[in-house]
């Protein structure tokens, strides 16, 4: 990556809006299968890095997409009428409480652009989604990282951080949390929201809510006007390649977000696919059952290998590569897995140098992972 100084000199006489943008590193996605094939010549690849649905998407989605093929020259419905109607019914909210996005990342960005300025602050937890810090830097704002508690959110400390920083405009909470998989209970979240000034937006990032439906905090919307819930169709619904998400909020907040979002920010194919996916809750139940079964199997395998892990409420698990194991730190294991066609996720960007995040796959992929991991650890 280029240094801040070299990037700045290369830009001149152009100058970015905020100096903090120069400190940003481009977001690193999970390594694509195609990239691994190019680099290592491996054709049989198992990707367990990006928390995608290993069984794909609902068959109803395929039909819905096919029906849109003849309409690709036409712009989509910019308001997403039919998808919003379906989401309103599903979540028991009014249509005017919904904002659609090009994935949930788009909505997080819209929220930051709508509410955060250069003199403001964004509060978030250590070991929470790295994009939260990036959003603060993009806005030239202060990013306030609160130390984690048992790899999860320390709500009392976060409340104190908001009190200490009166310029706080947004506090982000991922529940279940990415990348650790920890979960907050509804009661403690409600108590936290009640402690936050009404001028601070509490954004609940529920990208993995389908894997932990008991942590659904939809009821908070009825009680607090400063709560926004952001969800995605990229994970359990299996539409990561189409990019579609949604936000639930008060009508007033949604009105503002819809003023800021780009026109036609969700494609016609994505709108149709998301509506079809939402209608097939049997598929979501199947997804959840497979995930639970395979998660339990993986936990037993990690125990047998002597590897620690954090109990997860999502579709991934964070695994510790023991520090005392010579030449087997996470970076070494990550590279060795790549060379054998298995992609997982490094967590160095979070400061978790001895941990890997592993998505839960289907049985065949999980067995391939464990066999490869066992072979690497044994050889070392």
Swiss-Prot record:
It comes from the Bacteria. It catalyses: L-histidinol phosphate + 2-oxoglutarate = 3-(imidazol-4-yl)-2-oxopropyl phosphate + L-glutamate. Keywords: Amino-acid biosynthesis, Aminotransferase, Histidine biosynthesis, Pyridoxal phosphate, Transferase. GO terms for biological process: L-histidine biosynthetic process. One of its GO terms (molecular function) is pyridoxal phosphate binding. Its cofactor is pyridoxal 5'-phosphate. Its EC number is 2.6.1.9. Pathway: Amino-acid biosynthesis; L-histidine biosynthesis; L-histidine from 5-phospho-alpha-D-ribose 1-diphosphate: step 7/9. SUPFAM superfamilies: PLP-dependent transferases. Gene3D superfamilies: Aspartate Aminotransferase, domain 1, Type I PLP-dependent aspartate aminotransferase-like (Major domain). The modification N6-(pyridoxal phosphate)lysine is found at residue 235. InterPro entries: Aminotrans_II_pyridoxalP_BS (IPR001917), Aminotransferase_I/II_large (IPR004839), HisP_aminotrans (IPR005861), HistidinolP_aminotransfase (IPR050106), PyrdxlP-dep_Trfase (IPR015424), PyrdxlP-dep_Trfase_major (IPR015421), PyrdxlP-dep_Trfase_small (IPR015422). Pfam families: Aminotran_1_2. PROSITE patterns: AA_TRANSFER_CLASS_2 (PS00599). Homodimer. Belongs to the class-II pyridoxal-phosphate-dependent aminotransferase family. Histidinol-phosphate aminotransferase subfamily. NCBIfam families: hisC. This is Histidinol-phosphate aminotransferase 1.
